[in-house]
A protein has these predicted regions:
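Conserved anion/nucleotide-ligand pocket segment
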Residues: 147-151
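Metallocofactor- and cofactor-centric catalytic cores in central/energy metabolism, strongly enriched
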Residues: 2-146
Length: 151
């Protein structure tokens, strides 16, 4: 189970940047049973199951072009390997994304820099004092970001 991250964790840069975001490996598990089970649930669970059904129909239709649209920093949130696998396995035909998704975050990690698990409740003044940027509950070392920008 993931450890709980509460308000005002850490007091220095090293303690704040101690848990890198891990990218999900879609090949490491079979999610079909849980998604099938969601079709009998409520709220967005049924929507998720229906979306999976539609996606499977799209994959089966050789005349269908599949566009993956991204906004925001989903790659920073742990989806970068997922997107790579979708392309490698011909599960999407095109990607439409904001600059933050591809230029900033993917390039940042391609250079070897990391995103870190954090807290949306962390005091922003403390983060600024430690030269750390925050994307909701994800941290970036500002010095790494500046090195990326200079590349």
């Amino acid at each position: 189970m993931n450890k709980k991250i509460g308000p005002n964790i850490g007091h220095n840069k090293k303690s704040l940047l101690n848990t890198p975001v891990e990218h999900i490996d879609i090949k490491s598990f079979d999610a079909r049973k849980i998604i099938d089970g969601m079709s009998k649930m409520s709220f967005t669970s049924r929507d998720t199951a229906r979306a999976a059904d539609i996606y499977n129909e799209m994959l089966a239709d050789k005349d269908c072009s599949i566009f993956l649209t991204l906004a925001g920093s989903t790659s920073a949130g742990g989806c970068m390997d997922l997107y790579t696998d979708l392309v490698k396995h011909n599960m999407i035909d095109a990607v439409v994304a904001t600059g933050a998704s591809i230029i900033d975050m993917d390039f940042f990690e391609a250079l070897g820099f990391k995103h870190y698990q954090g807290s949306q409740f962390q005091d922003d003044t403390e983060l600024r004092n430690n030269y750390i940027d925050r994307i909701y509950d994800t941290y970036i070392d500002e010095e790494d970001l500046q090195a990326c920008d200079k590349t």
